[in-house]
Curated annotation (Swiss-Prot):
This is Small ribosomal subunit protein uS5. GO terms for cellular component: small ribosomal subunit. NCBIfam families: rpsE_bact. It comes from Methylobacterium radiotolerans (strain ATCC 27329 / DSM 1819 / JCM 2831 / NBRC 15690 / NCIMB 10815 / 0-1). Residues 23-86 form the S5 DRBM domain. Belongs to the universal ribosomal protein uS5 family. Residues 1-20, 161-195 are annotated as: Disordered. GO terms for molecular function: rRNA binding; structural constituent of ribosome.
Length: 195
C-alpha cells in the first residue's frame, strides 16, 4: 500500500523543510561590491552566513549575487554543505583552550566555567551561538576582517580534541587520561604559588 500525503507529490519539499528547520543561521556580514563596466557601475552583494544546529555542528558559507536575499540564500546553502562537528564538554563549552589563525586574523578560545556566557565579539559570537556553545571566552587579535575571523575560529574549533579522541590516539583509557590530568593539577598549582 502506498502512503498518502497531503498535497500530493513525494514529499521531498516537506523532508527538506524539516531538515532545514533544525538549523539556525546568522548573517555575519554583507558587503556591497561594484563592478565597473562600460555603462557605469554594476552593483552586487556578498554575504557571509554561519549555520548550526546548536548541538555541536556548525558551518559557514559565502554567497554572491545581484540581490541581497539571493546572496544570503547562496551563502546559507554553502554553509550547510560545509558543516563540521565540534565536541563540547558537558554540551556547553570547549574541552581545552585552542588557538586558530587564518591570514592576519588570530583567535584565542578558552573554556569557561558554567554561567560565564559567550564572551566574544562580532563574527565569533555568531559561530558560538549557532554551534550551541554556552560558556566560552574568546579574543581576536590582528585582522578584524569578518571573513578571516570566522575562518580562524573554524581552524581553532577543528584543533579541539575530546578526551575520548586523545585517549584513542594514545591507546589508553579515558579514565587513565583524566586521572593523570587530576594528578597533574595540584603540582601546577603549587608551582604557581612558589613563583
Amino acid at each position: 500500500m502506498a502512503r498518502e500525503r497531503e498535497g500530493g507529490g513525494r514529499g521531498r519539499r516537506e523532508d527538506r523543510e524539516e531538515r532545514d528547520s533544525e538549523f539556525v543561521d546568522k548573517l555575519v556580514h554583507i558587503n556591497r561590491v561594484a563592478k565597473v563596466v562600460k555603462g557605469g557601475r554594476r552593483f552586487g552583494f556578498a554575504a557571509l552566513v554561519v549555520v548550526g544546529d546548536q548541538k555541536g555542528r556548525v558551518g559557514f558559507g559565502h554567497g554572491k549575487a545581484r540581490e541581497v536575499p539571493e546572496a544570503i540564500r547562496k551563502a546559507t546553502e554553502a554553509a550547510k554543505r560545509g558543516l563540521i562537528r565540534v565536541s563540547l564538554r558537558e554540551g556547553r563549552t570547549l574541552h581545552h583552550d585552542v588557538n586558530g589563525r587564518h591570514g592576519a586574523g588570530k583567535v584565542i578560545l578558552r573554556a569557561a566555567p558554567q554561567g560565564t556566557g559567550i564572551i566574544a565579539g562580532g563574527p565569533m559570537r555568531a559561530v558560538f551561538e549557532t554551534l550551541g556553545m554556552q560558556d566560552v571566552v574568546a579574543k581576536s587579535l590582528g585582522s578584524s576582517n569578518p571573513y578571516n575571523l570566522v575562518r580562524a575560529t573554524f581552524e581553532a574549533l577543528k584543533n579541539e580534541d575530546s578526551p575520548r579522541s586523545v585517549a584513542a590516539r594514545r591507546g589508553i583509557k579515558v579514565s587513565t587520561l583524566q586521572s593523570r590530568r587530576r594528578d597533574a593539577d595540584p603540582a601546577d598549582q603549587s608551582e604557581a604559588a612558589v613563583a
